[in-house]
Amino acid sequence: MATQCVLFTDSSMNIGGQELQALQQMRALSEAGWQTQLLCKPQSAIAKRALDIGLAVQAIRFRNAFHLPSWRAAYQIIQTQNPRAFICHGSHDAIVCALVALWVRVLHGKRIPVYRVKTFQHGYPLSFAYNYLFTKTLTPSAYLRSLFLVNKSIDPKRIEVLYPGIDFAKLANMQHALPQHIAAWLSSHPGPVIAHGAILRGEKGHSVLLHALAIVKKTQPQIRYLIAGQGQDKPFLEALIQALGLDDNVLLTGIIEHIAPLLRVSDIAVLPSLNEPLGMFQIEAQFLEVPTITSDAGGIPETIAHEQTGLMVEAGNVAQWAKAIEWVLDHPLEAKQFARAGKQQVVKQFSLEANTAQLIRLIGG
């Protein structure tokens, strides 16, 4: 079974969507008969979560890309585990594993593929790492892949799209109650509900939606907007809500651990991002058959088809956003038909099974 081992790595102390995706991939591969192990920093959030759900964890400090004790630890694990591949979700861990794998190849003539998972790209990408250090770099969208290929020196075969896998069965069976403070607010503020789950940061487009809401309120005075998330823009958004006269229309819910209860009480789900590698909220909304409106930023168009599975508007265009919201409210049957078609598409494109099958193909199963 040692030859069927896949080592996942992450050098972050925190946990977010990418780390949760790594743990989900580990569980899926384990269920498919593979041995998996997570190499990560001791006392990190991902280490705790992995242990809580019964995954194998090995602590490596990954202090930086050239941390010799981390190199030594990775080399020793290779010697004992004989892995089929590394799947690296962080920066320091990816370089450590790539360099150690190169050393193993020089010393022992054994090639160990190293796959680097990247969910962002800032600045101009340099070709050396992507052409020579990593077997392939995996991106969650074709849009993000295109940001790497602006450097014509990067081999396109080295950058591959791996759409995230979503556990739709778990989402469908999620029976958690809506947090009490949200349920109480909705009870005292009747009207159609718009839901938006995202970190409170400028590029997520909350201010665009608020300005659109001020327009919609003229004909739909009871419209409600639930903003789920936390982040640095909270004071700015609170001030904007007050300035636009939307105090009775908008609730900043804070972080919600389970998004399904929020979506189930919503009439519309929105993703007004100004920049987005892919987005997950709109995929989950479509699965739950909530009429969905998104911007056309980044990789979002890969997740929704305009006037087929939802509506898509120009990023940052307040007037278009207001018009789209009004259309959904005025055409509930057509909007619901879009949502049902959206469910079929996202299940096909973003299922856990599709993600796992592609991973197994990559690592040579």
Language-model segments: what does each one mean?
Residues C88-V96, K118-T119:
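Short His-centered aromatic/hydrophobic patch
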Residues L39-C40, P291-T294, I304:
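Short hydrophobic beta-strand element within catalytic cores of glycosyltransferases
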Residues I255, L274:
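Aromatic "clamp/platform" in nucleotide-sugar-dependent glycosyltransferases that forms part
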Residues V106-A142:
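A conserved, positively charged/aromatic
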Residues Q320, W327, E334-Q349, N355-R361:
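A short, well-ordered alpha-helix in the C-terminal region of glycosyltransferases
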Residues H306-E307, L311-V318, W327-L333:
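Conserved acidic donor-binding segment of nucleotide-sugar-dependent glycosyltransferases
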Residues L7-T9, S187-K204, L210-L213:
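Conserved donor-binding/catalytic core segment of Leloir-type glycosyltransferases
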